[in-house]
Amino acid sequence: MSLLSRGLPICTALAMILGGSAAFAETALIGGVSQKDFKGATGAPAGGSASPLYFANNVYSGETVATPDAGATRLTFQDLTELHLGSNSTVVLDHFIYDPTTRTGDAAISFSKGIFRFVTGDIQNKSNVKLTTPTTSLTIRGTNFKLIVNDAGTIVEVKEGHVEIKPCGGTAETRLVSPGEAVQVTASCNVKSIALGDVPTDPGTDAGGPRDGSPGHEPHAPPGRSGANG
C-alpha cells in the first residue's frame, strides 16, 4: 500500500518517504508522480542520469523531468499544485518549498520545451511561484493555464485566474493574461494575442481536466518514489 492510498497528511507522508533513492539523497523531496498510466516519462537529478518515472515515484528539487513523443505525465507538488506534461516536453524542477501550517512557500520551475498545464494548489503567496521559459517569466495569480514552449517562443493560454508575463527578462512590456485569452511571446520578444483555436493541443494536457476524478486523475497528496515500480 502506498503512502498516498493511506490518506496521510501531506507533511506526514513526505516525512515517511524521505528515504528515497541514493541518487537524490542530497536534494529536497518536493512532490511525486500522480498519473497512474506510465507514458515514458523520465526523471534525472542534477548532473545524473535519467530513470523512468512511474506512478507514486518521488520528484526532487533540481530534477529534470522529460517525456518522449506521444508521452505524458502529471506531477503533484506538496501543496497539491499540479503540473501536466504533454508530448516531447522537458522541465527543470528548481525547487518547491511549502509550509502547510501557514500555507505559504516559494517555488521555481524552468520550462525548456514542450506543452504543459499548470494548476495552482493551496499555496497562498502565489507571487512567490516563479515560472520561466527561454523567452518569458511568469507570475501566477490563482491559476489554471496551458503553456507551450517551442522554437517560435512561448504561448500562454489562461483557463482560470490570471498570469502576468514578463517577456525576455523584462526587456518588453509586462502583460496580464486573463481567462479565455492566449498570448504568444515570440523568440524575438514580440508579444501578440492569438486565437484560442491556434493554441496547440495534446492528450497529456487536454484530455480530462485537473482534479476531475477521471481514471488516473484523482486528487491526492504527493506520492513517493517507492513500491513495486520504484
Where are these regions (language model features)?
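Flexible, surface-exposed loop/linker segments and immediately adjacent secondary-structure boundaries
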Residues: 23-227
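Eukaryotic intrinsically disordered, low-complexity regions
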Residues: 3, 225-230
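Bacterial N-terminal signal peptides
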Residues: 11-19
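Bacterial N-terminal signal peptides that target proteins for export
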Residues: 1-11
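Cytosolic regulatory regions built on CNB/CRP/Popeye-like sensor folds
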Residues: 2-4, 17, 26-31
